[in-house]
Amino acid sequence: KIGRLPTWVALPSGLASGSLIVALIGMYWDISLHIDQGRDPGPLANPAHYFILAGLFGVLCSGVIAIALTGEDRPSPSAVRLPNRWWSPLGAIVICTCGAVSLIAFPLDDIWHRIFGQDVTLWGPTHLLLIGGATFSILGAWILHAEGVLVGEGTLLEPVEYIEGLIA
């Protein structure tokens, strides 16, 4: 356990949070580069893309780590049985799915731009997959946290209480 939550909640939640911050920094940097320089020649053509990719990969890894830390033990009542006799917290499945959707959208975005040119706005289909996957991974982290509260001694407000303790 880390604090009052099981390790399969605390560790992946921290990794997902840090990874999303890295991806967000990359996204803001990428948008500013596109505003200044226009379309870049490929998916790995500017350094901001590496931050985005690293962040999205971290999100996917956090879901995989949550599954790996539970193994063959059923972690919560809402856990899902995997084909290899392992159990997965529902939140971990949501996080993995969101991370995978975002990572798949990255090369699709390059194909989209090669076919249709530069987007007029940020809200093209592949950008929605990228942003949506990252955003909904937060929902997966909340679900994972709620599952941990069910089996641990923590509360749903524990992260808020922790931050309040740091500020006070």
Task: Give residue ranges: language-model regions.
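N-terminal regions that are enriched for targeting/export leaders
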Residues: 1-40
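Alpha-helical transmembrane segments
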Residues: 13-26, 95-103, 166-168
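Residues within membrane-spanning alpha-helices of integral membrane proteins
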Residues: 16, 20, 49, 53-56, ...
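Membrane-embedded alpha-helical transmembrane segments of multi-pass integral membrane proteins
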Residues: 22-29, 55, 62, 101, ...
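Membrane-interface interhelical loops and short amphipathic "cap" helices
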Residues: 28-50, 108-128
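Transmembrane alpha-helix boundary signature
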Residues: 32-35, 62-79, 107-117, 146-147
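Membrane helical hairpin/interfacial module
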Residues: 48-95
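Membrane-interface helix-loop-helix junctions at boundaries between adjacent transmembrane segments
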Residues: 80-94, 106-166
